[in-house]
Amino acid sequence: MGIAKEFREFAVKGNVIDLAVGVIIGGAFGKIVDSVVSDLIMPVVGLVFGKLDFSNLFIVLGSVPEGTPYTLEAIRKAGVPVLAYGNFITVAVNFVILAFIIFVMVKQINRLKRETPVEPPAPPATPEDIQLLREIRDSLKR
């Protein structure tokens, strides 16, 4: 039972739970970024460059069997090696956007941390005997 108890203590620690929440949110956030890239950004980029679908951009590195449709999926099913650079472009744009969003978030968090001023601790109260000595000194000066 010692191992089970140790594991429970380990799993309930704040860092492990924070990590689990981060992974779950990161997975969901990754899906949002994928959707933004594939549904919003890549169609605009494709429109600008004259191609609407980057996923079908590829270079065939072998011979294509007769009767095989000239699509990436069909050529891959036929076992022909291909260089699928269109998919790479989509994934690279996805990565750049995700990295930029994370950069902006970290920058904002750091800014908020800097803006929160740390108040210096209040000086300790002057002991009563010192206070009395100061009052005596001040009265003698007059």
Swiss-Prot record:
GO terms for molecular function: mechanosensitive monoatomic ion channel activity. It is a multi-pass membrane protein. One of its GO terms (cellular component) is plasma membrane. Pfam families: MscL. It comes from the Bacteria. InterPro entries: Mechanosensitive_channel_CS, MS_channel, MSC/AndL, MscL_channel. Gene3D superfamilies: Large-conductance mechanosensitive channel, MscL, domain 1. Keywords: Cell inner membrane, Cell membrane, Ion channel, Ion transport, Membrane, Transmembrane, Transmembrane helix, Transport. It is found in: Cell inner membrane. The chain crosses the membrane at residues 10-30, 40-60, 86-106. Homopentamer. Channel that opens in response to stretch forces in the membrane lipid bilayer. May participate in the regulation of osmotic pressure changes within the cell. This is Large-conductance mechanosensitive channel. It comes from Acidovorax ebreus (strain TPSY) (Diaphorobacter sp. (strain TPSY)).
